[in-house]
């Protein structure tokens, strides 16, 4: 059984440690590992062997890392798996918790161990007692700072004792703001989603709440799911969230403050399909007038509706005598903004509306030298999230066992939402 190379990967498939033993495989082939694994999971296959061209990946998952042996054909998979598990056992003798952070902290020790444990792809010394005679360097262990007793810290300092309500209710809002900059030809140049989970809590006593999100949601560093998974970045929690519980099983468990607060915030860097797309056609007439044809198109599902849509179209600063015609909504010229604003109270999904505008333009040359600011769009879409995040459950646990009503609402709104004009 000859191993060509060894890899330790994080849960996104990124290489943390790599060791090439035989030089007979393409080391970049490991980049295909995570994609192959996702495909197998979608098919329902759980075999610990993946194949890409003439390279086999034999792997195990331990905590939040993958240990992968890359081999050519005709290998004893059982022996390789046994060796990988032995690696975990030996590593734990040096730095106790074998996980992504400790692997990064102890990469020097790991490289020394891999060199001693395997020679030209064949296992050699795997007994930790013997290895410790050769490799005496101590690993860096992950140490959790001891916590002071709850009585000293007043562990629930954010909530008072003795709170009472005649009607027990919880309101939870998932609010996502879409930041986007698109070119005039429809290419999304920059996009991100900035989200927050806001709560209003009116509950008696000292309740514990448990919040579960849908399975497609991943937290940064927590791992990887299928190709349609959503990974939240820059996640920040309110101090009431039990981080130890979250680190263990990703359950968001907390004793909430009374009243309104932000439970968590997050960011999602992804290519966002424009929810409302604006096409513009501009035509100048004999250096004295300019005409705009504006087409607004909603590109979200028909069952959703955007409310209070405002489309702000910039015009030359000296434009005047505006005339507008639109199939829906109202249009107002705002010279202080050097723009006209098209307002549509309700904009259903899958719809397309048209606006034409004619303005006098005393000095066309100045308009050309100014350049054109981007079109800005404001909107709010209830019962909808761009990321696909959903609340799967919100449990309320209180020792008196009272019934409480949880209300969940989703809102997607504009952030910096801009489109350049031709």
Swiss-Prot record:
* Highest taxon of the lineage: Eukaryota
Places the protein is found: Golgi apparatus; Cytoplasmic vesicle, Clathrin-coated vesicle membrane; Cell projection, Dendrite
InterPro entries in UniProt: Adaptor_comp_med_subunit (IPR050431), AP2_Mu_C_sf (IPR036168), AP_mu_sigma_su (IPR022775), Clathrin_mu (IPR001392), Clathrin_mu_CS (IPR018240), Longin-like_dom_sf (IPR011012), MHD (IPR028565)
Any one of the GO CC terms: clathrin-coated vesicle
Primary role: Component of the adaptor complexes which link clathrin to receptors in coated vesicles. Clathrin-associated protein complexes are believed to interact with the cytoplasmic tails of membrane proteins, leading to their selection and concentration. Required for many aspects of development and behavior, including negative regulation of vulval differentiation. Required for the dendritic localization of potassium channel kvs-4 in the cholinergic motor neuron DA9.
Q: What protein family is recorded?
A: Belongs to the adaptor complexes medium subunit family.
Under the subunit heading, UniProt states: Adaptor protein complex 1 (AP-1) is a heterotetramer composed of two large adaptins (gamma- and beta'-type subunits), a medium adaptin (mu-type subunit AP47) and a small adaptin (sigma-type subunit AP19). Interacts (via N-terminus) with kvs-4.
Q: Could you tell me what this protein is called?
A: AP-1 complex subunit mu-1-I
Q: Which organism is it from?
A: Caenorhabditis elegans
């Amino acid at each position: 059984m000859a191993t060509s190379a060894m890899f330790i990967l994080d849960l996104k498939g990124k290489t943390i440690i790599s060791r090439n033993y035989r030089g007979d495989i393409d080391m970049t082939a490991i980049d295909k590992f995570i994609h192959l694994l996702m495909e197998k999971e979608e098919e329902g296959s759980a075999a610990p062997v993946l194949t890409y061209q003439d390279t086999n990946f034999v792997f195990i998952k331990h905590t939040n890392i993958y240990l992968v042996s890359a081999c050519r054909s005709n290998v004893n998979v059982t022996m390789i798996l046994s060796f990988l598990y032995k690696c975990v056992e030996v590593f734990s003798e040096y730095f106790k918790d074998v996980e992504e952070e400790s692997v990064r902290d102890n990469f020097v020790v790991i490289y020394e161990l891999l060199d001693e444990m395997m020679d030209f792809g064949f296992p050699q010394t795997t007994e930790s007692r013997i290895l410790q005679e050769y490799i005496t360097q101590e690993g860096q262990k992950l140490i959790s700072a001891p916590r002071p007793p709850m009585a000293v810290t007043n562990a629930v300092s954010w909530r008072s004792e003795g709170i009472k309500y005649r009607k027990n209710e919880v309101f939870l809002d998932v609010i996502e703001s879409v930041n986007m900059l698109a070119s005039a030809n429809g290419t999304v140049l920059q996009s991100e989603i900035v989200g927050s989970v806001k709560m209003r809590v009116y509950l008696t006593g000292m309740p514990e709440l448990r919040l579960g999100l849908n399975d497609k949601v991943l937290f940064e560093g927590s791992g990887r799911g299928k190709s349609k998974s959503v990974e939240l970045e820059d996640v920040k929690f309110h101090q009431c969230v039990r981080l130890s519980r979250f680190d263990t099983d990703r359950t968001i468990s907390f004793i909430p403050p009374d009243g309104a607060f932000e439970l968590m915030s997050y960011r999602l860097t992804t290519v966002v399909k424009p929810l409302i797309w604006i096409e513009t056609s501009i035509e100048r007439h004999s250096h004295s007038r300019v005409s705009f044809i504006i087409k607004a198109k909603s590109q979200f599902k028909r069952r959703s509706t955007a409310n209070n849509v405002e489309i702000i179209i910039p015009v030359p600063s000296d434009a005047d005598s505006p005339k507008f015609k639109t199939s829906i909504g109202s249009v107002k010229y705002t010279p202080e903004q050097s723009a006209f604003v098209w307002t549509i109270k309700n904009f259903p999904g899958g719809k397309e509306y048209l606006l034409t505008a004619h303005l006098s333009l005393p000095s066309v040359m100045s308009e050309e030298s100014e350049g054109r600011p981007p079109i800005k769009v404001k909107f709010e879409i209830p019962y909808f999230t761009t990321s696909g995040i959903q609340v799967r459950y919100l449990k309320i646990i209180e020792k008196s066992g009272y019934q409480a009503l949880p209300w969940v609402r989703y809102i997607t709104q504009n952030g910096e939402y801009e489109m350049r004009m031709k």
